[in-house]
């Protein structure tokens, strides 16, 4: 019996082991070599308008003197943010906060797809899509709309006609009911794997993305036949999926 997975395996902020830090180029590359189909990252504007890959409104790291520094991303220029050291001793050397462009360039050369969380919402839709175009990643990006709905979809598709989209649960599903291609392009993400919730998303005609997965909740999630499985950055998704597929072969 030939068993294979039919879902997208996504590593939330990469895959962290040892001294690696989330949302670093090393964490994203580690996700790639462990077999991820996709990585998830975040896009925020620095004070000078550069898209930075950082989850929180603040960025934390070490300066070149080894001192701990916390910066408000929106109030700090990119040069300062990208000089902050995330880790000094991981297997790929010193890691600093990356720009979105650096993340997309890595994805281009590794074949990864990317889920980009637009932390600035609609304001970031056009700039992020233009960066995706610049980096040769058209058709390989899922845009997390952060509530920008059909307005965001239309703006992005004018630049990236093969774009896919993701947002939270049934609220997003309801907001895209006029979008004829939602069944191919729109993922609803949720950590609620109940039949009621999953069926509601399916009934709206959207794709299902289950998030925050680890070894404890994966099997209950995969029973719902998701289109995307997004794993926590500390989850060994490769081992989890291999163990599951071995069990399937025994049925």
Where are these regions (language model features)?
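Phosphate-group recognition and catalysis centered on beta-loop-alpha active-site segments
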Residues: 1-251
């Amino acid at each position: 019996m030939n068993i294979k997975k039919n879902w997208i395996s996504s590593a939330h902020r990469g895959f962290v082991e040892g001294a690696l830090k989330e949302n670093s180029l090393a964490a994203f590359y580690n996700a790639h070599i462990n077999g991820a189909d996709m990585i998830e990252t975040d896009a925020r504007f620095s004070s000078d308008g550069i898209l930075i890959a950082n989850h929180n409104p603040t960025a934390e790291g070490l300066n070149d003197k080894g001192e701990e520094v916390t910066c408000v991303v929106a109030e700090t220029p990119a040069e300062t943010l990208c000089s902050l050291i995330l880790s000094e001793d991981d297997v790929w050397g010193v890691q600093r906060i990356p720009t979105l462009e650096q993340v997309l360039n890595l994805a281009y050369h590794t074949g990864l797809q990317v889920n980009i969380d637009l932390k600035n919402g609609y304001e970031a839709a056009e700039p992020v899509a233009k960066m995706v175009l610049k980096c040769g990643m058209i058709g390989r990006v899922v845009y997390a709309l952060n509530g920008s709905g059909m307005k965001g979809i239309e703006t992005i598709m004018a630049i990236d006609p093969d774009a896919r989209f993701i947002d939270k649960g049934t609220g997003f599903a309801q907001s895209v009911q006029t979008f004829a291609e939602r069944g191919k392009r729109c993922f609803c993400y949720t950590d609620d794997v109940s039949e009621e919730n999953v069926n509601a998303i399916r009934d709206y005609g959207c794709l299902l993305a289950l998030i925050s997965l680890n070894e404890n909740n994966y099997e209950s999630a995969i029973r719902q036949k998701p289109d995307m499985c997004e794993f926590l950055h500390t989850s060994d998704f490769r081992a989890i999926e291999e163990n599951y597929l071995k069990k399937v072969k025994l049925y």
